[in-house]
């Protein structure tokens, strides 16, 4: 794995990147449209978490010492680290100096965080990158109740951009600002572009965040 990522890490280093986003793809079902989210992979024993954490620590330490990059772990629906409890476990078994957290507001909500801001504050010291994704609460509820796959939810509109859904981004950015967060805020929302035109929605998300940032300043 270290050898395979060498060229990409060198590109990030050349461009003075500070973090590298890490999304766990082993066993993930996020790309399987016929597989319900309930069938996602899980670590069932503490020893499995410990072993996974040790591998991430080793990889993260290598990235930092070799390229000056911080590993930003992306919790994600349909993967091993999905729920708030999974995030708690991940943070407990990884070294803060080697593994940071990519906090994704939409995946946090969809993963079961009724209050994403509380989860954000809980792990603020580990946050090194942020994806600002909103959710349509009614669609998320239907996805859970009807056993949808991740991709089915995306196509039916579980996610949208900041300012178009249920998440309080004023509270999210206030928490980040209060903690002195200096990293990226990435507007992101997996949607069907035939239904939600990319430019229009990206512009709406940017305008929402920009307005909040200007008020905070």
Please report, for each region that a protein language model flagged, where it lies by residue.
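Active-site acidic/histidine proton-transfer and metal-coordination neighborhood
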Residues: 1-103
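Catalytic P-loop NTPase motifs of RecA-like helicase/translocase cores
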Residues: 79, 108-109
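Histidine-acidic metal/acid-base catalytic patches
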Residues: 16, 57, 61, 84-99, ...
């Amino acid at each position: 794995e270290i050898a395979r990522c060498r060229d990409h890490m060198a590109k990030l280093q050349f461009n003075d990147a500070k973090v590298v986003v890490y999304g766990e793809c082993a066993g993930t079902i996020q790309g399987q449209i016929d597989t319900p989210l309930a069938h996602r992979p899980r670590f069932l024993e503490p020893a499995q978490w410990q072993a996974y954490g040790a591998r991430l620590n080793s990889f993260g330490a290598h990235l930092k010492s070799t390229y000056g990059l911080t590993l930003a772990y992306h919790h994600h629906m349909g993967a091993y680290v999905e729920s708030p409890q999974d995030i708690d476990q991940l943070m407990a078994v990884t070294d803060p100096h080697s593994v940071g957290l990519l906090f994704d507001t939409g995946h946090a909500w969809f993963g079961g965080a009724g209050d994403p801001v509380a989860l954000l504050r809980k792990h603020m010291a580990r946050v090194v990158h942020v994806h600002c994704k909103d959710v349509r609460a009614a669609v998320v509820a239907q996805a859970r109740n009807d056993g949808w796959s991740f991709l089915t939810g995306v196509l039916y509109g579980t996610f949208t951009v900041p300012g178009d859904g249920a998440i309080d981004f004023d509270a999210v950015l206030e928490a980040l600002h209060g903690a002195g967060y200096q990293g990226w805020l990435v507007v992101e929302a997996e949607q069907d572009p035939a239904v939600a035109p990319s430019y229009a929605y990206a512009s709406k998300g940017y305008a929402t965040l920009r307005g909040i940032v200007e008020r905070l300043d």
